[in-house]
Amino acid sequence: MRTEPPVPTKALEAIRAALGPGAESVDAPILQPLGLLLDLAGEAMRARLFVVQAEGGAELCLRPDFTVAVARRHLDGGAASGRYFYEGPAFRAAPGTERPEEFVQMGVEAFAPPSGDGAAADAEIAGLAWRAATAGGRSDLSLWLGDVGLFAAFIESLGLPATLSARLKRVAGRPRLLQAELARAGHVAAPAANQGQLAALLAGRSEGDTAALLEEVWALAGIEPVGGRGPAEIAARLVRRAEAAAAPALGQPEAQAIAAFMAISEPAAAGLARVRGLAGGKAKALTAALAVWDARLTDLARSVPADRMRFAPALGHAFDYYDGLTFEVRSEALGPDRPVAVGGRYDGLLARLGGGPGRAVGCMVRPWRAFAGGEA
């Protein structure tokens, strides 16, 4: 396993000093449940994970990052609010490259009740990531901003059929699936019956009804599921497949608007103006979301120079639990594939981990990339 060179103590201390104040220092188990992480990132992530399994035991993996583990720790503690700082090694396989596979991460995860001011917290954490990244000494950094939730509001502005709108929102963080939707623009949807008997059977059913149907079939057949996905998760996947088969295709004008939205990559203020120009006729939710962005940029301008901020609404990360703001601090020398810092908002992850409603936002810094004499 390839490891990073050590970062000088002075640089580590500077980055730590930018992130740590006001946060409780925590650790996380190096071994994490594989199934949970694949559910959050998709099966394609498996190739990037170091998988371990004792004979007869559950599949585990070396932690690829800290966010999920820290969120689970927060939920286990039962507190409504919490702010946690972590520092330690993370592990991701990088076959066919010379990149380190064991590397140090530092970061902060902040949790609050659902009534908290999300936009202010977003700006605070993104600004924190910027200060921590610049503390390493690089002078070629820029802050890239995106928003998973803004895509949903933009889709609503186009006035699409409900089934198509829902499907597009679900694939927002999966470029391959979204491109497939754009590619079939203008095509007439085939009837569900032509997409297979299962799709025809499930068309129009809720996930709850489908899960109950699966359990009934298993009971009649005497099937006892062992491990793997449960009926609720299988039902969700089957219902989405049925919806995909029955959903109408995009029209060409709407597909072009979505493609233009996904291609935005401009200075922050200009990028928001571009979104406003692409909006459809039902833009109430989008107008509200853009007002939040105006406030967010005002807050960010207190810590990040305006000429260093860029807006790219399609910006995403390897894990698809982000459901609001996303951001990266990038180095011109390292390029977009090796960000110095990443983060964003992931309120929905708390419910997916078994918790109640709440707000969650965090950031992670790679010290070796932030260090001016480090990764090149």
Please describe what each predicted stretch is:
Residues 4-26, 30-33, 65-78, 84-138, ...:
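Positively charged, Gly/Ser-enriched RNA/tRNA-binding surfaces
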Residues 147, 173-176, 267:
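Short, solvent-exposed helix-helix connector turns and helix-capping sites enriched
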Residues 46-56, 159-191:
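Acidic, His- and aromatic-enriched active-site or binding-groove loops in soluble protein domains
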Residues 28-47, 146-156, 315-324:
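Beta-rich nucleic-acid/ligand-interaction surfaces
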Residues 1-9, 56, 60:
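Short, N-terminal intrinsically disordered low-complexity segments that are rich in Pro/Gly
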Residues 30-60, 93-95, 103:
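Polyanion/phosphate-binding surface patch
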Residues 43, 65, 114-115, 124-127, ...:
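Polyanion-binding and phosphate-handling cores
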